[in-house]
Regions:
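Right-handed parallel beta-helix
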Residues: 1-63
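Surface-exposed, flexible loop/turn segments at secondary-structure boundaries
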Residues: 12, 41, 49, 71, ...
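Extracellular beta-strand/beta-solenoid scaffold signature
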Residues: 13-23, 36-39, 58-64, 80-86, ...
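Surface-exposed loop/turn motifs in large extracellular/passenger domains
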Residues: 20-31, 47-50, 69-72, 91-96, ...
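Functionally critical loop-and-helix segments that line ligand-binding/catalytic clefts
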Residues: 104-106, 110, 119, 132-138, ...
Length: 276
């Protein structure tokens, strides 16, 4: 399917038709299409596909994958959709070099992975979304989800991991101007996730040996934020003056030990990439 212009009816996104639907087929190539004002591009029980160079905007879910194993999503422009890419039970995905903008639906995300293992998310620009990246933990901890060299900026939450901690590797990503860079909710040890070589705009360390990496690890800690992390009903008050004041007091003179969200063992001093 190459070089098509696809539109749906001018109604609410849930009432529109799918711009493209694939099921029980394999080896499909969807290239350089202009798609807008649809419901979803839905791919079900269809492995080994290539989605390259497409533009999808003003829709509900740009790509909706279900059992679409070993598919490639490359160089697509996804803008003003409720969610950019959502994948359920789709192992072995490669999501690379996509630009995902303005997915600001309350429950939306730039990229959302659920019950998906052995995925590689590399070189994407994810800007101004409710959640930049959402993912649970892979079923098998050996089949990790890997995030490399992504630009994650101006999102409400940069990365949101839920479920049992572990099974994620994040290397060389840039996190800038997110309201909250990373949120991880679930049981387990936060050190079971691997973070290294990422740029954090909140890092306050030094680089005395001038190797481009901070001299000490970057620890993201939750102080008063634990209130809304552990009590979903309190998220409405996130960043309210009262919680901001409580967070300031907790950092100044902690009433209790803060919770470790993540530790980046070698934070970068400069971003690996910028937004073009």
């Amino acid at each position: 399917v190459r070089g098509n212009r696809i539109r749906s009816r001018p109604v609410d996104s849930a009432d529109r038709g799918d711009g493209l639907r694939l099921w029980y087929s394999s080896g499909n190539r969807i290239e350089n299409n202009d798609i807008a004002q649809i419901r979803d591009v839905t791919v079900t029980n269809s492995p080994r596909n290539r989605f390259t160079g497409n533009t999808i905007r003003d829709s509900r879910r740009a790509f909706n994958f279900l059992f679409a194993h070993r598919s490639l999503v490359d160089r697509n422009h996804l803008e003003q959709n409720s969610t950019g890419i959502i994948a359920l039970n789709s192992d072995g995905l490669i999501i690379r070099n996509n630009r995902i903008l303005h997915a600001m639906d309350a429950s939306g995300a730039g990229i959302a992975l659920k019950e998906t293992s052995a995925a590689l998310v590399i070189g994407n620009e994810i800007v101004h979304c409710a959640h930049g990246i959402m993912a649970d933990s892979p079923m098998n901890p050996l089949n990790r989800i890997v995030f490399i060299d992504n630009f994650v900026a101006h999102n409400i939450t940069g990365v949101y991991f839920y479920g049992a901690k572990g099974g994620h590797i994040a290397i060389g990503n840039t996190f800038r101007s997110n309201l909250w860079p990373v949120t991880i909710i679930g049981d387990g040890d936060p050190l079971d996730d691997t973070w290294t070589g990422n740029y954090w705009d909140g890092y306050e360390g030094f680089d005395q040996d001038q190797d481009g990496f901070g001299d000490r690890p970057y620890d993201l800690l939750a102080y008063a934020d634990r209130i809304w992390l552990e009590t979903p009903a309190a998220r409405f008050f996130r960043n309210s003056p009262v919680l901001e004041l409580l967070d300031f007091l907790e950092r100044l003179a902690p009433f209790s030990a803060p919770s470790l969200i993540l530790r980046d063992t070698a934070p970068r001093m400069k971003p690996t990439r910028t937004y073009n």
